[in-house]
Amino acid sequence: MSQFPSSAIFTVSRLNQTVRQLLEMEMGQIWLSGEISNLSQPSSGHWYFTLKDERAQVRCAMFRTSNRRVTFRPQNGQQIIIRATITLYEPRGDYQLLAESMQPAGDGLLQQQFEQLKQRLAAEGLFDQQFKQVLPSPAKQVGVITSVSGAALHDILQVLQRRDPSLPVIVYPTSVQGAEAPLQIVRAIELANQRDECDVLIVGRGGGSLEDLWSFNDERVARAIFASRIPIVSAVGHETDVTIADFVGDLRAPTPSAAAELVSRNQLELLRQIQSQRQRLEMAMDYYLAQRNREFTRLHHRLQQQHPQLRLARQQAQLVKLRQRLDDAMQQQLRQTSRRSERLQQRLMQQQPQTRIHRAQQRLQQLSYQMQSAVDRQLNQNKQKLGVACSRLEGVSPLATLARGYNVTTASDGKVLKNVAQITPGETLKTRLQDGWVESQVTTLAPNLSSVKKRRKSSSQS
């Protein structure tokens, strides 16, 4: 018999089911803050992530029907606040949170509000370039809307004093941080427009956190800047700080000191410009006087050219020149006519028959002499070639060999005999001498022993 009652023994499934029911009934919905990690966004549209702090973490899920209402894109490392239900995933025994809503925490929430306001005002056209006013150059009086106790005012006044001490400055004091600051900034802008004593305004403050600068991200401040008839330079924080006022303002300065430089004139630069203008004016005067002097010289020269005596002298010189040209032309014409007459006379002389016949006879005699010389030269060359050929022919002729005492012996069949082996005793042979033939009959053969040895050796080698 078992020592445990069966009703006290849980199965794993029953235990997980009981724990899930307890969690859902006892805890209900809760608000939870933490840092996102292990964020997963599969194609199903659901979100799975872990919410953690420095000592613990818990798994979370947010289904597609809920995350559709989230107005920002969550990222790992981001601090958020969620409203969720605690439950337990029975197959694994893991408890988790089912998030129903999500919003950024701290600066993340402020950044979300900043982006939403920025998009809305941009859609209304408050940032359009066509509404930007041009800053006066030079400014006659500058208004500064900022805190009288902040470093921004000190920096602005110091820069204006250094660059343009004669430029008047009016300060419209206001708070730049806190709940009341946006309304005070709006009233200062409206007051400056009502008094209409400045032709440019600097609105800004020194650096700080996003929360410290939040007054310049207020919609009321943005609309007051946009409605201002006086051009406004936005100078909020440092160069890396960006506010809504920077987008709405007519010009953005990275710092309050830079804003003071933008609205003021540099005295040294002004002196340099005056000197430059003076130099340009002097150069223009010098150029104008030089032009007038050249014009006077030209007119004086023209007046001298129109004097009657000078005109008469020019006409006389022209007459002499024309007379010389006429003489030259006549001489040229006479020379050409003389040369043409000489050429015609030469051609006439060349056309007389006696001269042509004489030239033809001379040519015929010359050709006859050349032909005779060529024939004699060719005959001599042929005689020389014939003599050389006869000498060479006699050198290789058999008759010449016979004339030197040699003979040629043939067998009865006419075959030329070259050695004893071709002859048999009793055979009749014919011998050719220089001046005839001799027939003889072979009685004895006496071969040369050295020739026989050579033939045998040659036969054995082959």
From Swiss-Prot:
Keywords: Cytoplasm, Exonuclease, Hydrolase, Nuclease. The keyword Protease does not apply. It is found in: Cytoplasm. HAMAP family: Exonuc_7_L (MF_00378). InterPro entries: Exonuc_VII_L, Exonuc_VII_lsu_C, OB-fold_nuc-bd_dom. CDD domains: ExoVII_LU_OBF. One of its GO terms (cellular component) is cytoplasm. Its EC number is 3.1.11.6. This is Exodeoxyribonuclease 7 large subunit. Heterooligomer composed of large and small subunits. One of its GO terms (molecular function) is exodeoxyribonuclease VII activity. It is an enzyme of class 3 (hydrolase).
